[in-house]
Each structure stands twice: as structure tokens, then as C-alpha cells.
Amino acid sequence: MAWADKYRPVDISELIMPSDELNSIIRWADSWRNNEVIKKSLILYGDPGTGKTTTATVIANYLNVPLIEMNASDERNADSMKRVALMSSLYSDLLSERRIPDRLILIDEADNIFESRDPKRGGDYGGITELLNVVKETRNPVIITMNDYYSFRSKRSGREIIDNSLVIEMRPYRRRNDQRYREFINKCLERCHYILKKEGKSLPENDIIRIIKENEPDIRSIINDLEAYAQDSNPGTRNKKIDIYRYVIDTFHSHDYDKLINSFSDADFDPDYYIKWIDQNLKEEYQDPEDLKNAYDILSIADLYSRLSYRANYMLTGISQEIAAGVSLMVKNKNRSTGRYSMPDIIKMYSSRKGINGARTLLEKLAALNHTSSNVIVSYLWFYRIIKRTAEFKRISRILDLSDNEVKQI
């Protein structure tokens, strides 16, 4: 089991969030426990990986009730919202005389509930309107999660749902120079040390801090990277991962191109590894569409030379690296602060404890099915994670002859 799942918080004291928000959530849960409800639903919104669904699970544990979840993969039009959410929330156990809740309803990714303007077109018409009815009439607590709060607020009935809910933004800090940021880093560091101790692993303190700062505030990504680093038995490889971070910073922020090029002679990584890091983090560094276009134009040329070096002339390898190092030369609006750089997705897969060989064969099989490359297919694994929930996946698995280990990696 992946560490992010194995060490997912189960107790409310394990949640990594500011004290004010945590206390507000506890008071909301206690209002249901004490039959003193003011707001019947709780909205948790924020970026992926900030703990929205985990928080809902922990609250269910706190209330000692089962969690009934309707997520983005379920059909969520008006009829299904009535049938599943409304029935689950309105009717308590008929054999119970308790006036406290006997279940917690989770509506996950509510900002993805779309409403058709024309009822005849079907789809998600009326879904949010019915969700409003649930929020108003429920006899059990309802938690609604979303990534795009402002998009949800602009939808039909969205604002009224918000007005009838306690709203918590899952954002651990506002600025990196405030007290909340330091508290968040310390809590993450404490959690990482706890996980490493339970797993019998160790990493230098500086490496752990680097992992946290590369991924924050995405706690899930922090733990995923922690696992990938800790499972790498070769300290030299771990040092290479830390070292590449400094080169990425220099690529995006250094004003001395010649100095950057000369420093590659001391680098302990190959050009393809470097190009993957730049590609992964380019969109986090530059926001202007024209800047991104120009930077990707440069990177595509570097990638072409990198591929040619494997097929024709190894001497082209160094040229590909020098070209990639020049991405910032074509950018007008540079980011003044250092971004949250993360390890390339494909490198994470290769580095994880699930096995380099298994990851490689999985990508090769999916790439062959789609007539593309392994580098391309890694960006579409999210699609196969959705397909995996359906009966159709069994047929695909048989066609590709996927092993149990390969299936687990999707």
C-alpha cells in the first residue's frame, strides 16, 4: 500500500491545517453531536491534495458514523441526486430513537456537477438545485468538497448552498513569510519523521525539508515523494534528485546563461533527466501564454536533439541540454519568486517502490495500445484510473495481459 494511503489521518488531531479552521470544523461536528445544528452542511474547498476528502473521512470517524460518498465518477443528475443523496440524508434508522446523526454524506467534487439549460438534453440538469434541497432538509451532516469554489458559486443555486453552509478553505497559509507557513512546514516535518520511523527508513533532515518545499501545500505529493526518496537504496541517486532542484532554479532565475552552461560539467545527471524536470515545472514557473509558447518551442528543439543523440550521434546530448537551459531567454514576464518544483511524473513512477521494471512495462503496453510513446502516455494515466472503475477495464487488462502488479500501478 502506498504511504499516502497507509498513513492517511484517521483521528482529527492528525489533520495538518491551521488551528482556527480545525476548531471551526470541530465545532461544526459537535453541533451535530449535541443536536445544536446551525449550518447543516460543511463546504471544504481548495487545490487537489490539500486533504478535503481525508478531512471528511476523519470527521466521520470523530462522529463515529459511516461515510456515504457520492463522487465524481457517479451519475449526478437531478434524479440520481434525489435518489442517492436525498434518501441517504433524510431518513435515519427507523429502529433508532437517537436524535444524533447516524451517517455522514459526502458530495465530492461538487464543482463538477454541470447543469444543462435545457431539461430535454438530460445530463446533470437540476443537480445543484437538488443538492440545495439536500442541504436545507437533511437530518444528517453533509460535507461538500470542491476545487473551484468561485465557479461553483456562479452556478444556479450554488450561492444559496454556500449561504447555508460553513465554508472552510483548505489553504494552510497565505504567504510564505507568515506564522501559518512555519507551522505548516513543522507539522509536515513531524509527520514525515513519524512515517519514516514507522517504516524503518531514514533521510537527512535537509532532504525532507526539500521534499516538503518542492510539493507544499499538496500533502499527498509530499508523502508520495517521501516514499520515492526513502525507497531509493542508492544515496547517490537521492543526492542527484536534490541536486537537480538547484539546476532547475538556476535555469528559471539565473541571468548568467554562460555560467549555467559551464556548471553542467559538475552535474551528476544526464540531459534527458534535466529536460524532463524543466518540462514538468515549466507551466508552474511561467503564466503568460506567449511566454509559455516560446519556452515550449525551445524545449521541443532540445527534446528533438536529445532523441537524435540516442539514435544517431551521442555528441548531440550536450547540445540538447544547452538548448533546454535557454528557456528563460525567451521569456519576458519572469516569476520573481521560486516556484514549487516537483519531480517529473514519469520519474516518480520509475523511482517508486512498486518497481522500475513493472512501471516501464505498464507504460510500454499502454503506449502500444494507443500508438504513442511511454513519455506521452504517462500524462494520460488519470484516464485509465477512471476506466479502471468500470467493467470495460477487465477487457483492456486481458488484451494487454496486465499483471496484478501492473494493474495496481494505474
From Swiss-Prot:
One Gene Ontology MF term: DNA clamp loader activity
Any one biological process term the GO annotation gives: DNA replication
Entry keywords, A to Z: ATP-binding, DNA replication, Nucleotide-binding
Coiled-coil zones: none
SMART domains, per database record: AAA
UniProt cross-references to InterPro entries, sorted A to Z: AAA+_ATPase (IPR003593), ATPase_AAA_core (IPR003959), P-loop_NTPase (IPR027417), Rep_factor-C_lsu (IPR023935)
Residues noted as binding ATP in the record, renumbered to the chain: G46, D47, P48, G49, T50, G51, K52, T53
Signal peptide extent: none
SUPFAM superfamilies the record matches: P-loop containing nucleoside triphosphate hydrolases
The UniProt record lists the keyword ATP-binding: yes
Record-stated family: Belongs to the activator 1 small subunits family. RfcL subfamily.
Assembly and oligomerization: Heteromultimer composed of small subunits (RfcS) and large subunits (RfcL).
NCBIfam families, per database record: PRK04195.1-5
Function of the molecule: Part of the RFC clamp loader complex which loads the PCNA sliding clamp onto DNA.
HAMAP family attached to this UniProt entry: RfcL
Protein name per UniProt: Replication factor C large subunit
Lineage start: Archaea, Methanobacteriati, Thermoplasmatota, Thermoplasmata, Thermoplasmatales
